[in-house]
Amino acid sequence: MLDSCNRRTGGLGSLRLDDISSYRSWLFINANIPEFTVSEFLTGRHLANEMLYYDGEYVKGAALECAEYVMANTAPSHVTGNTHFARFLNEDRINKFCDDCIKYLEKKLGVPAHGILSFDLKEDKNGEMKVTEINIRHMAYAGVMAHVGFDLIEDTIRIMEDGNCNNVVRNQYHHYDKPYIFLRDVDVEPIILESEEIFDDSKVYFNIK
């Protein structure tokens, strides 16, 4: 994947390269661009999580799959800043991988992880996870996660009030009690469903009783 270095999200000007001819064509069309990036084209799932660290301790974390994005067709990558459809996942390997990444960064930087750390990940064709972004804040779906049992918002307030995380329940690999999904669009409240099986029921589409 070639992408112009324009300091914007969404892969503006990006092109998937399948052969050397595509590469040469991109360079010809964008001859006035002094810098560009080359990255692997990842075909797997978009994964994400939210994790809480306190003075180097990994306190709790939970994961999800960002299956579709709001206004995806406006970006060449089909990835925008907000999730439209997501699945909540009970896959421990996601949080384990992210915690390993944080431990690596702690060692390299010589500082302990502290606060909310939110990962964006993408799987390659073999299902191996690659880090695409790490945010040092709550994500937009933090409130939705709270509704389905993973409430970092309440935990954050408790830490601010207590001055420590002694009263925060340790839960490094949170498991949701149901296969929840959520749907969200611009300027509307998110819709939370207990599973996506409803989409497989033809009676729902045709309002058959």
Q: Where would I find each of the regions flagged by the language model?
A:
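Short beta-strand or tight-loop elements
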Residues: 34, 45-47, 114-117
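ATP-dependent carboxylate/phosphate-activation module, predominantly the ATP-grasp catalytic core
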Residues: 12-21, 40-46, 50-106, 135-160
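ATP-dependent carboxylate activation and anion-phosphoryl transfer catalytic cores
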Residues: 90-209
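Structured catalytic cores of enzymes that bind and process phosphorylated ligands/cofactors
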Residues: 29-31
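ATP-grasp fold ATP-binding core
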Residues: 1-10, 33-44
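A short acidic, often aromatic-flanked loop/helix-cap motif at beta-alpha or helix-coil junctions
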Residues: 2, 22-23
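Short, solvent-exposed polar/charged micro-motifs at secondary-structure junctions
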Residues: 5-8, 46-51, 123, 127-128
